[in-house]
Amino acid sequence: MVAQPKVRTSARLPRGALDRETVVAAALDIADREGLGGVTMARVAEALGGSPMSLYRHLSDKQELLDAVADLAVSEIPAIVQDGRPWRVRLEEFALEVRRCALRHPALVEIVLATYVRGPAAASVGLDMIALLHEAGFDEDSSIRGFMALRNHIIGALAWEVSRFRGGGEEFAREVADNFVHEDTPADSPIRRLGDVVSEDPERQYMFGISHLLDGFEAELRR
């Protein structure tokens, strides 16, 4: 896990103390506290007690900054453990670690939704998942497709969870249900359960999707 220096004041740093790592850590701290909208070159410079122009010595533009912020957050995800346990157990454990990281850094989900995340940590996550699926018995193409299927579920589920919490949890669940359930909805319609399901443990919902994807993967391996 990468230690992240927290920069919460605008006290001016000593001359020469500003480097790329410090800038990115400050930007991640701002994203965690204020949301992605708070991450601007001016805001980061203010937090570091410098000028916006001083940041451009280390990052070419805001997009490079956001890529670096996302990669720093992703670097907290532990690598998939090579300990001889079944591939499925390790992949489920890894999926939970990804979720924990995203909940620590909700802005990460916003960045991933907006752009392709570049950086060594993000690449390592993908390579680890592909390697584990290949280890499980999938060929190269199927390993990549399996990774993409898992990635798409993870991003979608976490985007939903982050928006759910921002919407107020139970209140958000009621609003979602009200959008689908009306007075003329049949009493025995399963859609009437929507609010209850939306408001249940989000980790359970997240792992429901992971589990069913892996069920399909295992069925494919048995063919």
Model-found features: residue ranges?
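A structured, mid-to-C-terminal "fold-capping" secondary-structure block
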Residues: E170-R223
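Short, basic, alpha-helical segments at the C-terminal edge of helix-turn-helix-like DNA-binding modules
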Residues: A70-E76
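Hydrophobic alpha-helical connector segments
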Residues: A79-A121, E140-S143, L150
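Amphipathic alpha-helical interaction segments
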Residues: T22, E64, E93, S124, ...
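N-terminal intrinsically disordered/low-complexity leader segments
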Residues: M1-L18, A79, D188-D196
